[in-house]
């Protein structure tokens, strides 16, 4: 079985960025996705150009920070201050304009290209591209850009309209209370039994440390350090090798 451990939130803060780089060095994480509108974005771009992150995708973001498009061009996505709506408000919104989502996704993708990032896949922050208000626009944009994406049928069923490659499965259980070696092993063994020749993607959110900036930006903070410790541990790397689970990135997705 092949495993993609994708480190989400590259660009959120410098501590997150450093944690992701260390996970790459440890050899288990081979994929990450960058947020183009966060305090650590420029730092993440610099780390990429230093060769410390071999491959990178786009972490499309419409639930944190400000849009890269002018707020007046994406009014169904922002509040009165021009900030993105929070996820609870956005995902329950009935009047999200598909064209605005497409416009903003393209703006973030183009910003990544302009930064000389070789984007190799796309996913979305807080699963924005999976929830019903955004799914059609995310699918449309992904098909136009033509890059692989994270599976989009894990929350809202169906991805038949998606014309680009995805892993065979995506699992979100390595998160929060699910962050432990035993839980990760159980998840992977269940997929190895069900699809021994398949490719499964798991998200991860490592950080080298927790600081006030990270706490101000994310309700998920302390567990990021636990993830970092686990994902850089020799024990995990040896267990994966012993069970013939090959860690790959999206460049290897065929």
Indicate residue ranges for each PLM-predicted region.
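Gly/Ser/Thr-rich loops at beta-strand to alpha-helix junctions
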Residues: 126-130
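Terminal accessory/targeting
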Residues: 1-4, 14-54, 66-95, 99-103, ...
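N-terminal low-complexity, intrinsically disordered segments
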Residues: 56-61
